[in-house]
Every structure is written in structure tokens, then in C-alpha cells.
Design a protein with these regions (language model features):
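Catalytic cores of nucleic-acid endonucleases
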Residues: 108, 132-177
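Accessory nucleic acid-recognition modules appended to NTPase machines
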Residues: 1-125
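Conserved beta3 VAIK motif of the Hanks protein kinase fold
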Residues: 128
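Short conserved micro-motifs at the rims of enzyme active sites and ligand-binding pockets
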Residues: 79-81, 139-140, 169, 185-186
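Flexible, active-site-adjacent loop/turn segments at secondary-structure boundaries
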Residues: 59, 177-178
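Short, surface-exposed amphipathic charged segments that create phosphate/polyanion-binding patches used
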Residues: 64, 171-174, 186-187
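A broadly conserved detector of short glycine/acidic/proline-rich loop/turn motifs that flank catalytic sites
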Residues: 53, 73-74, 123, 131-132, ...
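Non-catalytic C-terminal interaction segments of nucleic acid-processing enzymes
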Residues: 179-187
Length: 187
């Protein structure tokens, strides 16, 4: 489980390379493939594959999916300190919350940038960028810059652990804890 949680957030081809290096002592390709199929089939309740969506072409891509744990407790059970990979942990928590609110969730791609989540429910669509802290001006610029190429008028959110309001240019900043405590979904 520790191996899974420490490599979960990388794209699938990289995941396969890491997995292959762990079992490379086995020389029979069929045996490796069978083990991999069995391994992945057993994980379907622990992890969810999230497709990548190209915002400009409005198409779901068939590559570069991301994987998220379905329950944050799985990571905690490995004994990993919460300070290790805090942004990934926060991203996973927001993913679980969006699912619990009934959203279909995809990872956004726009040009060479990534938007952590595109959340869609019926005709409602929202964009989410997750960061641990954005007090630093350069960090804030990097996070907000991702939205520059998104030309539609759907809500764009930046979620962080900061309590100060860093909303700007129509992009709404929220504290992650406040977001998680909202009653009626996104407000």
C-alpha cells in the first residue's frame, strides 16, 4: 500500500515503469502481464482513474490519466507523514469531495498547462486549482496563470490553506477547509 500511495499520482506509463522495475527479476513477460492485470483489477475499489480533458479541443484524451485514492484513510494507514506530499494529499481530498457532491471529475489540459480538476454536474461546470499555500507572489502567479487560456465563463477556483482572500480577475480563491465545509456544493 505504501508503494501504491507514493506512486499513485504519476501518470500510468510512469507507474508501469516503476512497477516493472520492482518486478524486473521475473523474466517471463506473460507472468509479469498476468501479475499486472491481477494487481490493477484488485485496486479498482482503492483508486479511481481520472481522464484528462483537453479544454481547447473539448475532447477527453486517451492518455495521461491520473489516479486518485477513493479514501484518504488508505494513505494515512501507510504511516506517511501528512507533511510529505501535502499538495497531492490536498488534491486527493478535493477530488473525493467533488465526487461526493455528485460531480463528474476530469483533469484539465490547456496547451502545456494542467488544471487540477474540471467538475461537471448537469450543465454546471467549474475549474479547480489546488495549492498548499499561495502567499508567495511567484506561486500565486503560477497558479493563476493557468487560467489565462480558459476563455469560457464558467467559475474558476483556487483552493489553498491560506485564510487571506487572494481572489483576482474573476478567479475565486477559497480556503480548502471552508470549501469542504460548504453545505450546498460550490458557492
Amino acid at each position: 500500500l505504501h508503494f501504491l500511495t507514493s506512486t499513485l499520482y504519476i501518470q500510468f506509463p510512469k507507474f508501469l515503469n516503476v512497477l516493472y522495475s520492482k518486478i524486473s527479476k521475473i523474466t517471463n513477460f506473460r507472468a509479469i502481464f498476468s501479475m499486472l492485470v491481477l494487481f490493477i483489477s484488485r485496486l479498482t475499489h482503492l483508486i479511481k482513474k481520472v481522464p484528462r480533458y483537453d479544454i481547447l479541443s473539448k475532447k477527453t484524451l486517451k492518455v495521461d490519466e491520473k489516479y486518485y485514492l477513493t479514501d484518504h484513510g488508505f494513505r494515512q494507514a501507510t504511516g506517511c507523514p501528512i507533511t510529505q506530499d501535502i499538495e497531492r494529499i490536498l488534491e486527493n481530498i478535493v477530488y473525493i469531495e467533488l465526487l461526493s457532491r455528485g460531480y463528474e471529475v476530469k483533469v484539465g489540459k490547456i496547451k502545456d498547462k494542467e488544471i487540477n480538476f474540471i467538475a461537471k454536474k448537469e450543465k454546471d461546470l467549474s475549474y479547480y486549482q489546488i495549492s498548499y499555500k499561495i502567499r508567495d507572489e511567484k506561486t500565486r502567479e503560477r497558479i493563476y496563470e493557468t487560467y489565462n487560456s480558459v476563455t469560457d465563463n464558467f467559475p474558476k477556483y483556487v483552493l489553498s490553506m491560506d485564510h487571506s482572500n487572494f481572489s483576482q480577475d474573476g478567479i475565486i480563491h477559497k480556503n480548502i477547509i471552508d470549501f469542504l465545509l460548504e453545505d450546498e456544493g460550490v458557492k
